[in-house]
Amino acid sequence: LDSMSRYNYGNEDTQLEVGEKVSYFYSATRRAYMENLLKSLDGRSVQIQGSNPARGNLSMDFYRGYPTGKSTYLDEVLGEKFRITEPLEQPKWDIIADSTKQILNYDCQMARCTFKGRIWTAWFTADIPLDNGPWKLYGLPGLILRAYDSKQQYIFDCVGMKQAKE
């Protein structure tokens, strides 16, 4: 498979959960689908084939910092489940001076990097001092609220935030 080829995943809700030592990025669409499916099965079994937009197209889960100093990527391809654990690789960002805009009422600044074969642009806010973001994008002096690759095959937009319950 060519990860640089054009594949349209469509729009999908993803979620980034940030803890003190670990962050978790996943498809919220897929998680909601699976939770509803499990509730409806009530002990029965079912076989699912083909693509269903309601269940989400992204099957990956990504943990940064688990285990410590590493990242863990979980995915499913053609029914086979995979787990890849590797050392953390931090993108080498160039912060673009005099580039600002507002996202969700936060002042954001632009940064760029080449990472995993793509040129990425990210907008981060120093108002939320977490060096985190979607997928494997992190390492800026604030939370990434928008990121996209130069071909705009992947676009991550933060549409809301909430504080988790303790």
Model-derived features: positions:
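Extracellular or lumenal secretory-pathway regions
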Residues: L1-K101, D107, W120-T121, Q152-E166
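Structural motif
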Residues: I103-L104, F115
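Gly/Pro-enriched, hydrophobic low-complexity segments
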Residues: R112-K165
